[in-house]
């Protein structure tokens, strides 16, 4: 599971690292150290002209058939082992609506007792302090009442590596840089190869540290949330 992420990096640096289309309008986002589901997320998609394009999308995928937005609270993650057949995600997969979800890292809560009543939050980041780029899917949804179109996304999850297994039984799929072009469809790849990318990250690429429990409150969004305790 991945239910909180952070992104505070400067966009001018992100667009170079991610090789975004430099002519694309800069997305409007603010630094946020505690993004919950339904928050706007910075993603990259392959546009109709083949360019790597930045977008802001709501976190929590809204399939085209959804009656309302409530489903987003259960679709912010998609399990790599089953998303291709799940009604909420399979259309996005079949249509090739894959994306890169750009973050600086995420948080996870470790149970301190068997019943999970007491938990300690941890921050997870790349060991080299680089961007953490997660595998995602995206979709368009039209609000039946207002007629507004909403673009939304989900983060794919997989089994944990040894580092993450100490905290949780799932982790987000963090894509290798070499896999970005194929995941976005900039380079062709069979489904089998794409699905093989959805694996746990090597332990060495991540670092983990405990943080203040204030991160549990989504009203708290500042930089102090990611500081080690």
Enumerate the language-model features and the residues they cover.
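Short linear sequence motif anchored by a di-proline
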Residues: 1-229
């Amino acid at each position: 599971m991945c239910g909180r992420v952070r992104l505070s990096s400067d966009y001018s640096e992100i667009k170079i690292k991610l090789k975004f289309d430099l002519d694309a309008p800069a997305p409007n986002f603010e630094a946020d150290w505690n993004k919950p589901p339904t928050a706007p997320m910075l993603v990259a998609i392959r546009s109709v002209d083949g360019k790597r394009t930045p977008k802001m999308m709501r976190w929590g995928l809204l399939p085209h058939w959804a009656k309302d937005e409530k489903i987003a609270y259960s679709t912010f993650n998609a399990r790599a082992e089953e998303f291709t057949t799940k009604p909420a995600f399979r259309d996005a997969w079949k249509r090739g609506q894959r994306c890169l979800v750009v973050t600086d890292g995420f948080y996870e809560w470790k149970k301190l007792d068997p019943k999970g009543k007491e938990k300690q939050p941890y921050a997870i980041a790349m060991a080299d302090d680089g961007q953490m780029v997660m595998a995602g899917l995206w979709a368009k949804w039209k609000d039946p009442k207002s007629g507004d179109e909403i673009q939304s996304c989900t983060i794919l999850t997989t089994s944990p590596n040894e580092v993450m297994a100490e905290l949780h039984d799932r982790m987000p799929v963090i894509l290798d840089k070499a896999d970005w072009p194929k995941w976005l469809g900039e380079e062709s790849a069979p489904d089998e190869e794409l699905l093989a990318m959805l694996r746990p990250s090597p332990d060495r690429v991540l670092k983990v540290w405990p943080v203040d429990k204030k991160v549990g409150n989504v009203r708290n969004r500042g930089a102090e949330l990611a500081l080690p305790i």
